[in-house]
């Protein structure tokens, strides 16, 4: 009996213990540094960007130069400043989106896993259904119906991303609940809330953190795609996706569209590096299965 | 496992049925790999499906569809290449107008043949006009005020209007009024009866076949392209120069790249800046001109009571820097001096246009008694991004005067109903001519189409309305021109309408092509285009 | 059963979505003057059944659906079924090509990464695969178009064929197959040239995904005793990898491949818009922005059915590759 308890706890502790190892990987460090720099940029954009991102200068379509590090766009706005300010839109929104999706998905998945029965059935059928409809179609329909705008785009993406999280959380809760040491705890008469906080939560928390890192990257991608299609950010907002969309109209001035794209790549890559390293430290399978779509 | 397989088979067969049924309906493209004659490619960043527009009586008066309707269908009158001021004969060899400009009699040519060889007569004209009226779809307004459309004999067609309408010869040039082969269409579900809106079933037929007498016929159509073939039996003196014309739906950004590698190709959707970037390319001819479409702003009294305050509107009027708007609107762009575009009868000159005067704007704002006004600037996000640029400029202009404008650009599906439902505040919108005549611009007057969208209702400005009525009914062009100029001068002083610019428009073609000339009515005369 | 549930769900959702919009599709879709003409608006609403109460509209829609009738698109004014039949082959050709590319590349790279675990090769492949998963497809498509078409002229531009090349006789709607069937080799070459760039752009994300998952699945198998046994027996490394490791690792890889069809659909919306590819990605984007309800529901239903089908095939393949499941 005691052997079982040790075994189960072992897996968790090994995982946590592996994290410092993950930090030693160069790519993890790159990811961490990149992500941290973008967070700093998002916080400090008003002070570090050389110009007002909306200010229209007389010099249109200027190639990158000392005066304008990344050139100017079709209205004479400084692309560098706009890219920096873009972080202030994408990062907080992606975080808001991920926390909303985790609150909804985590609660529903947790309930489904813990209670089982018809609750489980309803939640999982709902999740299946959202899974079957492609993300962007659903998001486009929602945004088209509610009207474009970043907030509506966030709602739309939350609507399509909770099921992935619900599945993982449900799976983790189930596995933990079925494990011997929770059963033992019950036999020994420990109350339900104790089982939840002491046994279930710690086992669920790790993978969920990994998933969150990966989801932030995905959220940024999807939000920028909606903005690119004209369904997210609205001009003149300096949002990366809509900046790329403007750039597409002006191929000759390649810098208008290329740099916002580089910004998206770098921040999503940062979160993916982080998430990937953390995932190696935890049980990869559960996350893999849930994140397929 | 057993259950799974059964379910799978069930689903597979379901999908199979669905697709099988669907495939039965779809036209299979024909294969003739060896192009007998030359092919012309025209690219347009088209807003929607070509397939919707293949019935001229429904899909006509669509700027993007007009070039191929014009190539497939012949209308009663037409214009000489490059002209839009004097209607000349086409299917009608001549016409006469009564002195009161209410009755128009068209003599129909006897030698016009449809593409299937049938001879065209006045019955076909009567059918076409009645069908357009009774389908009551988009182009129906072309026949507003018409009380009678009759073939009095095989080669005479008479139109009667309830009010004097000297614009009728201009209206009948419209590609939506291209003459349809009535026998052929009736045999395939076409109807011109009064209940045609419900009984006409020719839409699908027109999706596969064209029924006109023009220099080209439609060979195939789908969402991405329309293929036109030369009409082998074309009755006119000038045979089409190309065996095939392909009208493709291509994004502007892609057009910019593709044209640099092409031959026999024309790009219609390049912005002024994009076109300007091609000027150095010796293989291309870039033609930039002033579009007859006007971009205007309006202050909606229905949503913003301050718009009823003429001083407030004037603060906006004199606060806008028109030249800064022209600067972002591409090569060929010009300020719109009034609502009537500079190309048409009755237009104001550039010297008469409103000029920016920040001091005057500020004093007008003070006179209005409104402190620190904030207004929402509503507009449609356009594919070229022009409206975004204009709105950003206007916002900056008005900030100089002390008016805060919050930009609210929306995609067309949201913005258009708001605009049409008079829900804009400070609106930014466009007007493309329905026909090249100042009568089309009556829409901007109180109680009319655009007027109502600005909450500017009948009785709001009696002097303007009276002048408008006289200008609309005047029969001779000299009088009309003068009255329309007076009308617009008044509009520029007292109306909530703020004409802004006529954008620059560019047509880029490979330089082996000739006669790539823009028309405000059908955009491009495909049949006239040739090669050196 | 799942299908019926899905159809009901998708249609209810689309109905609710498009009807919380305060705007009238008649006013949005009619021309400038016609939209202010009460008769034209009334005729439009009658034609599309918009004059009936919402529940009635829904029942009518379901009734038609039973006969395989998806209604008429408000945008194209054709049967949605006709529209889909026209656009699906284009998307199928693009999606299948990109999936094949992504599988071949992703699984190969994943196996290599696992065998070279934590060495330089593994790190490089990690950057490549995560890079593929981190690059916005719309941006990648534009950059690829700029570089490979505009600057280098290695590939032709947008569309499925050059303008002057006529499509092959309709058989499957997939131009590569149809042209070969008709013996039109020049058309085949042209269609492959047009296909290659959008398919690669579309494959980038899934390639990364498959590399990551193959790597972890293979790593897990490599730790097993029978792999060590096989190696100890002196079997060639390739035989070990393909006969033992890859087979044992395939269930999780298959799962991911099945789920990844969702990514492909998202990608096609963006890629088709940029490459003027006349498929359902472009169609659905235009339908959604025009609030064309019948078209939106039609596309959603179709894609959902494909998704379910693909994942059922994956379930069946499970049985083929995994002896334990076959026994059960």
Feature roles, as predicted:
Chain B
Residues 224, 232-278, 302, 404:
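Ligand-site clamp/hinge motif
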Residues 314, 326, 400, 406-415, ...:
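Extracytoplasmic/peripheral linker and loop segments enriched in polar/acidic and small residues
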Residues 43-99, 130, 211-212:
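N-terminal lobe/hinge region of extracytoplasmic solute-binding protein
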Residues 141-194:
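Surface-exposed binding/hinge segments that line
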Residues 63, 176-237:
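Gly/Pro-rich hinge or "lid" segments in bacterial periplasmic/extracellular proteins
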Residues 303-344, 386-390, 491-496:
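Periplasmic-binding protein-like
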Residues 507-532:
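Long beta-strand-rich cores associated with HINT superfamily self-processing modules
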Residues 334-367, 383-389:
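Structural transition elements
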């Amino acid at each position: 009996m005691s052997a079982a308890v040790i075994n189960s706890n072992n897996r968790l502790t090994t995982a946590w213990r592996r994290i410092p190892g993950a930090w030693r990987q160069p790519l993890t460090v790159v990811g961490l540094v990149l992500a941290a720099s973008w967070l700093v940029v998002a916080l400090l954009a008003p002070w570090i960007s050389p110009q007002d991102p909306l200010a229209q200068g007389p010099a249109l379509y200027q190639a990158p130069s000392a005066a304008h590090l990344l050139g100017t766009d079709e209205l004479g706005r400084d692309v560098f400043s706009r890219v920096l300010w873009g972080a202030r839109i994408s990062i907080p929104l992606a975080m808001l989106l991920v926390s909303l999706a985790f609150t909804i998905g985590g609660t529903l998945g947790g309930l489904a896993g813990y209670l089982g029965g018809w609750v489980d059935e309803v939640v999982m059928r709902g999740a299946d259904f959202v899974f079957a409809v492609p993300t962007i179609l659903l998001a486009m329909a929602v945004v088209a119906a509610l009207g474009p705008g970043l907030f509506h785009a966030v709602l739309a993406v939350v609507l399509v991303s909770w099921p992935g999280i619900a599945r993982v959380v449900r799976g983790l809760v189930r596995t933990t609940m079925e494990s011997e040491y929770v059963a033992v705890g019950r036999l020994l008469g420990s109350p339900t809330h104790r089982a939840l906080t002491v046994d279930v939560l710690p086992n669920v928390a790790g993978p969920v953190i990994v998933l969150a890192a990966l989801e932030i990257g995905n959220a940024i991608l999807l939000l920028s795609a909606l903005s690119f299609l004209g369904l997210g950010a609205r001009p003149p907002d300096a949002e990366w996706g809509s900046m790329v969309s403007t750039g597409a109209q002006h191929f000759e001035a390649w810098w208008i569209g290329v740099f916002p794209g580089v910004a998206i790549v770098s921040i999503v890559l940062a979160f993916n590096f982080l998430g990937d390293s953390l995932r190696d430290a935890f049980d990869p399978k559960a996350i893999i299965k849930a994140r397929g779509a | 496992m057993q259950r799974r397989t059964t379910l799978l088979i069930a689903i597979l067969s379901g999908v199979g049925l669905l697709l099988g049924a669907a495939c039965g309906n779809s036209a299979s493209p024909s294969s003739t790999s060896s192009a007998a004659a030359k092919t012309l490619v025209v690219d347009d960043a088209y807003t929607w499906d070509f397939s919707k527009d293949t019935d001229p009586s429904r899909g006509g008066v669509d700027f993007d569809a007009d070039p191929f309707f014009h190539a497939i269908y012949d209308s009663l009158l037409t214009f000489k290449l490059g002209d839009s001021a004097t209607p000349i004969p086409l299917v009608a060899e001549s016409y006469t107008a009564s002195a009161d400009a209410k009755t128009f009699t068209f003599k129909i040519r006897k030698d016009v043949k449809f593409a299937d060889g049938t001879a065209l007569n006045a019955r076909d004209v009567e059918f076409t006009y009645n069908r357009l009226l009774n389908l009551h779809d988009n182009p129906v307004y072309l026949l507003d005020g018409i009380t009678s459309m009759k073939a009095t004999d095989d080669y005479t067609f008479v139109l009667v209007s309830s009010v004097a309408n000297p614009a009728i010869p201009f209206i009948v040039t419209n590609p939506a009024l291209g003459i349809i082969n009535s026998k052929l269409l009736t045999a395939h579900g076409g109807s011109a009866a009064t209940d045609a809106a419900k009984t006409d079933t020719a839409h699908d037929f027109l999706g596969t076949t064209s029924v006109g007498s023009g220099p080209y016929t439609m060979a195939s159509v789908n969402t991405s392209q329309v293929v036109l073939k030369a009409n082998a039996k074309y009755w006119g003196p000038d045979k089409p120069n190309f065996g095939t014309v392909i009208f493709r739906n291509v994004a502007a950004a892609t057009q910019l790249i593709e044209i640099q590698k092409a031959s026999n190709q024309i790009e219609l959707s390049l912005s002024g800046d994009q076109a300007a970037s091609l000027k150095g390319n010796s293989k291309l001819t870039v033609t930039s001109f002033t579009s007859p479409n006007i971009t205007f702003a309006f202050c909606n009294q229905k949503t913003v009571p301050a718009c009823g305050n003429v001083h407030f509107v004037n603060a906006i009027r004199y606060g806008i820097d028109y030249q800064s708007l022209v600067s972002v609107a591409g090569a060929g762009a010009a300020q719109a001096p009034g609502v009537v575009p500079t190309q048409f009868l009755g237009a104001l000159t550039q010297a008469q246009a409103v000029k920016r005067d920040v001091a005057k704007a500020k004093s007008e704002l003070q006179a209005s008694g409104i402190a620190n006004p904030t207004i929402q600037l509503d507009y449609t996000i356009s594919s070229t991004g022009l409206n975004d640029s204009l709105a950003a400029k206007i916002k900056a202009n008005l900030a100089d005067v002390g008016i805060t404008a919050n930009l609210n650009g929306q995609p067309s599906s949201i913005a258009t109903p708001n605009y049409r439902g008079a829900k804009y505040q400070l609106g930014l919108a466009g007007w493309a001519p329905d026909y090249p005549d100042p009568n089309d611009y009556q829409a901007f007057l109180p109680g009319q189409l655009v007027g109502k969208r600005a909450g500017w209702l009948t009785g709001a400005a009696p002097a303007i309305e009276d002048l408008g009525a006289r200008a609309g009914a005047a029969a001779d062009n000299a009088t009309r021109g003068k009255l329309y100029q007076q009308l617009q001068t008044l509009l520029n002083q007292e109306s909530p309408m703020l004409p802004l610019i006529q954008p620059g428009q560019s047509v880029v073609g490979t330089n082996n092509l000739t006669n790539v000339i823009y028309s405000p009515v059908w955009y491009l005369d495909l049949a006239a285009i040739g090669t050196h | 059963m799942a299908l019926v549930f899905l159809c009901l769900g998708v249609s209810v959702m689309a109905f609710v979505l498009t009807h919380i919009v305060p705007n009238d599709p008649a006013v949005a879709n009619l021309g400038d003057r016609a939209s202010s003409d009460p008769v034209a608006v009334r005729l439009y609403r009658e034609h599309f059944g918009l004059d009936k109460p919402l529940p009635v509209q829904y029942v009518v829609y379901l009734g038609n659906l039973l006969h395989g009738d998806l209604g008429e698109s408000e945008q194209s004014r054709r049967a949605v079924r006709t529209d889909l039949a026209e656009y699906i082959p284009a998307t199928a050709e693009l999606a299948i090509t990109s999936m094949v590319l992504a599988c071949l590349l992703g699984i190969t790279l994943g196996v290599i990464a696992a065998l070279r675990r934590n060495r330089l090769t593994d790190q490089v492949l990690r950057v490549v695969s995560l890079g593929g998963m981190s690059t916005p497809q719309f941006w990648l498509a534009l950059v690829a178009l700029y570089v490979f078409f505009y600057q280098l002229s290695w590939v032709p531009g947008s569309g499925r064929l050059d303008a002057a090349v006529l499509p092959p006789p309709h058989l499957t709607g997939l131009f590569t197959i149809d042209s070969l069937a008709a013996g039109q080799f020049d058309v085949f070459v042209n269609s492959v040239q047009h296909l290659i760039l959008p398919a690669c752009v579309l494959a980038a994300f899934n390639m990364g995904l498959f590399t990551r998952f193959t790597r972890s699945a293979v790593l897990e198998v490599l730790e097993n005793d029978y792999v060590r046994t096989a190696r100890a027996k002196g079997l060639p490394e390739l035989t070990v990898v393909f006969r033992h490791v890859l087979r044992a690792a395939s269930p999780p890889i298959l799962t991911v491949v099945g789920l990844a069809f969702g990514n492909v659909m998202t990608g096609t919306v963006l890629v088709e818009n940029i490459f003027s590819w006349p498929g359902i990605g472009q169609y659905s984007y235009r339908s959604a922005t025009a609030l064309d309800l019948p078209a939106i529901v039609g596309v959603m239903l179709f894609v959902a059915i494909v998704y379910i089908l693909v994942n059922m095939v994956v379930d069946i393949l499970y049985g083929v590759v995994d002896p334990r499941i076959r026994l059960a």
